[in-house]
Structure formats: C-alpha cells, structure tokens
C-alpha cells in the first residue's frame, strides 16, 4: 500500500505522469478479495504474476476496459475516495429500486388492462346492444394491452439474470417508442369523446345497468386481490392516459439515480427525451382537436349575448389587422406563407363540394322529369302498340299501374342508393369550410407577426396556425378520398339504374312489330314527304321557301382560287426606290394574307409603294399598292412609312394605339344594312335586294349576287339538316347571301372548306381587318 499512499500525497501535476502509471493504479483497484499474490514479500513490484483462471481474466479485462473509457480519463485521474464509492453504491441501490418499481407498476397496469378486457369489454361486446358503442367507449384498448405486454417482456428480458451494473433500460424504450406513440395517440385522441359517450349512457337506465353490472364484477375481483377500490368506469378508462404520462417521471428519476459511468446513462437520457416528446405530441394532437371543436361550433348556436361579449377592442383591432394584411397580400406588398399540400387539397375539396351539389340538384331534377313524363310515355306506348297491330290481331295491353312499376322501383332505388348518400355527404362540407376560413384568418395573423420579433402573441399565432393547418391537411386528404369514392359509386349506380330501366322498357314493348328500315336515307324520305305536303293548296303559298332553298343549295358555284403571288426580291425593292418618292413608300409591319379578290399577300418588312389610299368602293382602310412585281389591295393597318423621319413625326398617342392594339381581333356587329347600318357605301344594293324580297315577294332568281364577304364563326354551330352548314368556333367562312330565299335575314348562305349551307346570322362576326 505504500505506492498508493505516496500517490495520494502527490499533487495533481504529478498524478498525470503517463498512461502506464494510471493503468497500474487501476489494476490494483480492480483486484478482488479472492485474488492471491504469488510472493507476498514483494510489495512495490507491480509486474508480479497473478494466479487467475481464464474466465476471471476475461471478466477483469472487460471491467478494466470500461474503466479506461475517455469518460474515466477526462473526469478524474485520481483514485475514487471511499465517499465516492459510497455515493455510487447508494445511487445503484436507488436505481435498482426504481427499476423494480417500473417493472412492478407495468405488471400491475397490464393486469388491469387484462381484467378490463375480460370483465368489461368482451361481455359488453358479446351482448351486442344496439345503442351501446363499445368501440367508442374503449377505442383501441386491445392495442394498448399488446404494447404494454411487449414493453413488460422487454423490461424483464433486460433485467433477468443480468448484473445491475450491466442492465440497460433506456434501450428498451428507444426500441419501442414508435409503436408506443402511435397507439397511445389514438387512445388519448378519442378519450374525451368516449367520456362524453359514457355520460350519455349513464343517463339511460338500461345501458347504465349493463355498465354497472360489468363494473361490479370488476370491483369484486379487485377486493379479492387486495387492490385499491375502483371508483367508476371513468377511472378505468383513464388508466392508459395516466400510465403514458408516468413514463417520463420514472425515466427521469432513473437517470438521476444512474452514475455517469454506467453504460445505461446515455441511453436513459435519450429514452427520457423520447417519452417526453411522445407526451408533447399527444398534448399537441389534443390541442389541435380542441381548436377544431372550438371553431367548428356553429354561429347559430351562439346567443346574441355571446356574440356581443366577443365584441371588444381586442377583437376589433385583430380584425382590422387582418383586413390590412389581406390588402397587402393582394397588392403584393407582403409575402405570404404557403402550403402547397393544403392548397391542392383545398382546391380538390371545393371541386368535390360543387360536383356533389350539382349532382344532387340534377339527379333530383331528372327523377322529377321522368316522373312527369311516365304517364305520357305509357300512353304513347299503348298507342304505338295499337298502331302496330292490324285489325283483329290480339293486342295484349298491360294495366297502367303494372306498367308504371319499373319507374317506381327506379325512383325508390335512386333515392336510396344515390340521393341519400350524396345528401348526407353534402351536409358534411360546411364544417370543413368554416375551418378553412378560420385557417385563413390565423394565416393572416401569422403573416402580420412575422416582421416583428418573437413575442408571446406571435408565438401563439404561429402555434394556432400550424395546429389548424396540420389538422386540416391531415383530415382533408382523408375526407377528399372518401368523398371521391362515394361520388363515383353514386354515379356508377345512377348509370346502372338508368340502363336497367331502359332494358325493362325495351322488354315491355318487345312484342311491338318492328318497322323495316327504309332503303333510302331518312333525310330523303323526309324531303319527299315534305314535297307532298307542300303540294297541298293551303300550304302552297309557302312552298317556294323549301324548294327554292333546295335548288339554291344544289347549285354549284366554282370555287375561286387566288393565284400565287411571287415574293419580293432585291431587284423589286430597287425598282420601287428609284421609281417612287420617299413619302409614297411604306413597309409591312407584319404578315398580311389576302382575304378578298384583288388583295395581295405581304411578308413582314416588304417594301411597297402606295398608288391610291382607298379602294374602288371609297373605303380608306384598303390601299392600292405596288410591290414591284405585282399590284393589289392591302389593309392600311398593316403598313407603316418607310421614311424614318416621317415615322418619328407621328403623334405619341397614335403610336401607342398602333403598337398596343394592332394584334387584337375586334369583332363588330354581323348584321347587314337592313337592320342597322350598311356594310359599306356601295353595299346598299344588297340591302335593297333583301328589302325588295321582303316587300314584293319576288322570285328567288331575282336575288343579286354580292361580293363574297369574309366572316368568322363567333360560336360553334352544328347542322341539323343537309341544308345547314356546321361551323367550328373562329372558323373563317364566305358569305354568299345575307338572307335566305324567303328574305329571312336570320339565316345566311355561307361557304366553308368547299361546303355550302345556311347558318344563323347571330353566330357570325366580322373583324375590323383581316
């Protein structure tokens, strides 16, 4: 012992000579009482051999390695004093006591769960009482029982036949923290609802007797086993919540009772943080739910007194800040916190709400119309049945009430399978809509608090927004998925019911004689019948309309093909520059296509010489120009002066109009001169000709051909007969006549893509320029 006493008297500097010195001292400290020295006379020689078994040497080397960890080297290099050893001993004793308490309380808790399942949950579930919701009362208590059993088995495995110095409890909680949080989250989330359901059950005598019977049997078992008396069903249901809140307390106390050199110290710290986070997450989930329930309360349930009590300086100030922040966002004066997931789900939510509402409205209207049309349909069917049979043939007519039975079944099944689910789904949308609006209010509060420093008010706004946003994102996804499923199922059911109704109707009238299909087309047959009708005396005056329109349509007018104009070359431009003055030269601002007879095509930048600033009809919008290779008419809006000096003298306002509005296609009225104003000064002959047919009723051959006018289809039009012309939206058409053969100006004779026919005049529009 002389070297140890000498080492105790040395200073701190002399104690840290080298690593060999420390190892020799630790070696002496780790010697056990059963170790024997070969030569007891050798006191100062530390290199003496020891007489030890191989197992003792292995255990000794493990302990020595633990002592030589960096913690041991950095904490203190001096030999532990007896007081330190006593302190470590007391901590280890307290640690062992806490571990025993942890395992025993977990075992008692698991026993309580087993008794609850055996004596309460299973008997109530086996009775199958209609008004008693066992799942609503106890939620996922079976999962809570399973996770508790798993935790207990892991704790027993970590402590059984393991020395106290080697027991690691923290790793057990780190291993099970994931499922532990998920299961207790569900139970704690539904506990408040379960408590409310329990209170409602206790108000009904029959349900209260069933609960009291199960609770009494459980109390008897508690008395037999000497456990604390069970107060009521609520104290049994709250046990899982109390248990999960006790885990952080036990682990914190266990960590404080564990020496820093113990291998479980670091794991206990991580386990304590993990179970603490579990409780924080459970409380946050509970707070989110309370926040949703707070804002989900309907305003109709609030009295006038409650509404007035909310009106104060703080509420007025908060709302004014929201309005100000909203205006800043609209004017892009302030950035906004965005959540793309929420925006996507909100858009889908609003689309689903609109679709469901329209489906309910349209399907209800469809059922009503079918109901109104059913009597007439049955009557028409009976009459067709009579017509299809010749005299003397058997005509079995079924009763009216029996014939209407398929529709009654269709209406009843539609109400049950389609309208009822859709109406129930539609009633669920107002709640989320109100929460979405409240979420936007909290977002405005959060945005307004961002520029300011962290305060209690800003932290509260942030937490409320994040809680409400997270709750909406999570539940909107589930709601939208369920709503889409219900909507698609209802639409498929509606289509199936309509198909079944048509099949029943077809089978009901399958005995009606089938009419052979005509060899000629149906349009030709109809035309022949109409010709026979027009030969009658009392319709003979109006017969010219149909026949003349048919003859006019059958006349084929050869399509006019505009000749291809050669493009301008450098020689052509040189010719123009040498022949004409600078004030007569213009350039094409953009490509111009020929739209009328005697028009020419121009490419952007081509040089032209203006010969005359009007057309033969006197219109100044079309100029007669020379490109050096061809002469023709071009709209003046496509030209700009070639002389740069002249272009600079143009007024600023005129430049603004030319540059900013030259690419806009402005549609003007498509009416001819007979309604408002003439198309041009020279088109009065067209108006006169149309008016002459109205007043004099002359023959169709007296119509005068007018120049082709280029118009565009403002709306798409689908032809209903062979005499009409189908048009696509924005399709260019040639107008051949501005009225039909009877003088009706509502229908024009048009030509498009080699096809001719009549189109409604109000479907056409003319551009200000080509």
From Swiss-Prot:
It comes from Mus musculus (Mouse). One of its GO terms (molecular function) is guanyl-nucleotide exchange factor activity. SMART domains: BAR, RhoGEF, SH3. PANTHER family: NUCLEAR FUSION PROTEIN FUS2, RHO GUANINE NUCLEOTIDE EXCHANGE FACTOR 38. Residues 53-66 have a biased composition (Basic and acidic residues). The modification Phosphothreonine is found at residue 34. The keyword Phosphoprotein applies. Residues 33-88 are annotated as: Disordered. Residues 327-542 form the BAR domain. The gene is Arhgef38. It comes from the Eukaryota. May act as a guanine-nucleotide releasing factor. Gene3D superfamilies: Arfaptin homology (AH) domain/BAR domain, Dbl homology (DH) domain, SH3 Domains. One of its GO terms (cellular component) is cytoplasm. Keywords: Coiled coil, Guanine-nucleotide releasing factor, Phosphoprotein, Repeat, SH3 domain. This is Rho guanine nucleotide exchange factor 38. SUPFAM superfamilies: BAR/IMD domain-like, DBL homology domain (DH-domain), SH3-domain. Residues 37-47 have a biased composition (Low complexity). Residues 94-285 form the DH domain.
